[in-house]
């Protein structure tokens, strides 16, 4: 599966199939959330949250790819990510793009 953030695939002719998307809501456990709260007092990267967001992006992307595959797509173009805070310590990641067939 080819994944690109452009609205084309260089050197390829494509046929649009459909919008595809994937999403997930992730949260950290209380212990890691507490330690991250302490880290905000001294500054620096909140590694527990960075890991949470990386995992969420991967899950959402995999869900989008599975939807594209189910439609017979060879690629997803024009991919975009969006995030939002759901509550303290939890975030939603949404990824969407256009499923296409390479001709």
UniProtKB/Swiss-Prot annotation:
It comes from the Bacteria. InterPro entries: UPF0145_dom_sf, UPF0145_YbjQ-like. Disulfide bonds: none annotated. Belongs to the UPF0145 family. This is UPF0145 protein NT01CX_0170.
């Amino acid at each position: 599966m080819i994944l690109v953030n452009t609205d084309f695939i260089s050197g390829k002719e494509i046929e649009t199939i459909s919008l595809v998307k994937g999403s997930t809501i992730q949260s950290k456990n209380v212990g890691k959330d507490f330690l991250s709260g302490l880290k905000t007092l001294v500054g620096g990267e909140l590694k527990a949250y960075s890991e949470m967001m990386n995992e969420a992006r991967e899950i959402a992307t995999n869900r989008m790819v599975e939807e594209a595959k189910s439609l017979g797509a060879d690629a997803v173009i024009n991919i975009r990510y969006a995030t939002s805070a759901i509550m303290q310590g939890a975030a939603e990641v949404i990824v969407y793009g256009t499923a296409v067939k390479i001709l």
